[in-house]
Amino acid sequence: MSSKTALLLLQMGGPDSLDAVHPFLMNLFTDRDIIKIGPAFLQPFIARRIVNKRAPKVEEYYRQIGGKSPIRELTEAQGEGLQQLLGEDFRSFVAMRYSRPSTIDALAAIKRAGIERVIALSLYPHYSKATTGSSLNELKRVLKESGAKFEISYIDRFYNHPLYIKALSEKVVQGLASFPDRKDVEIVFSAHSLPQSFIEEGDPYLDHIQETVRLVMEQVGEGSHTLCFQSKASRVKWLEPSTEATIEQMAKAGKKNLLMVPLSFVSDHIETLYEIDIQYGEEAKALGIERFVRSESLNSSPLFLECLADLVKTAAK
């Protein structure tokens, strides 16, 4: 057996081709940790109807950003960067919740490598049962069904880690530098939305998001800012205000310069590359916003990788 520790990076995933869009959406819409559609036994049938209707439109979104999601390559790069920081005692693996490599794939690879110790690191900074909770539930289910025996530790949040806040603040400051006068800029933090019912049932996601914004603005300094939510995925009430409504409100208030800050996303994918850059960018231009800029995603930011490495070192003690 190997003395190495497996670093298992848990991420949402994304289609690696246009043909993979349909199965990706099916995996998403049949996950009852994030979306409950009718009784459990009916959800696969209802999900298929929804996905059959949505898939052509979503395929077009992916076509506009290169025909696939870059999230696998970006997550693997984060893993490689972590290995360099942590040294030869660690080896990284990736488990995508709704695409390949799946949790089953990742655990099989760890087993083949003869590694017995695993640190599962969720790449969602803000805990929610719909994201980290779902990934951990899937991991525990696969472990139980496979009978695999690992010594396993979990890292399920880092929304207030000083290095995460520093890395995010760095990106905001860099984004502000692209404007002639930062005093004229509205900083718009855009987080992935969740059904309002999750928060009412005690999910800490919104509290975590708000704390991240507070801590980032402490480092960035003075500046007008707001928090909104994107990527609503069903008809039930989700967190508000929506990003679309916020951009419209900013335009009506006479704001001309917006800095979009993707929050709850640590890698570029459809929510940043299409929704913010293309969809919201076009909407903002049509509404009279003169300068619409998105701060860079963290991806393999050195500060962000240092944050993840610190989390792993703490979990490994």
From Swiss-Prot:
Give the E.C. number(s).
4.98.1.1
Q: Can you list the GO cellular component terms from the UniProt entry?
A: cytoplasm
InterPro entries the UniProt entry points to: Ferrochelatase, Ferrochelatase_AS, Ferrochelatase_C, Ferrochelatase_N
Q: What metabolic or biological pathway is this protein involved in? A: Porphyrin-containing compound metabolism; protoheme biosynthesis; protoheme from protoporphyrin-IX: step 1/1
Instruction: Tell me the GO BP annotations in alphabetical order.
Output: heme biosynthetic process
The reply to whether Cytoplasm figures as a keyword in the UniProt entry is yes
Q: Where in the cell is it found?
A: Cytoplasm
| A Pfam family the protein falls into | Ferrochelatase
A molecular-function term among this protein's GO annotations: metal ion binding
Assigned protein family: Belongs to the ferrochelatase family.
Which PANTHER family does the protein's record reference? Answer: FERROCHELATASE, FERROCHELATASE, MITOCHONDRIAL
**Under which name does UniProt file this protein?**
Ferrochelatase
Recorded name of the encoding gene: hemH
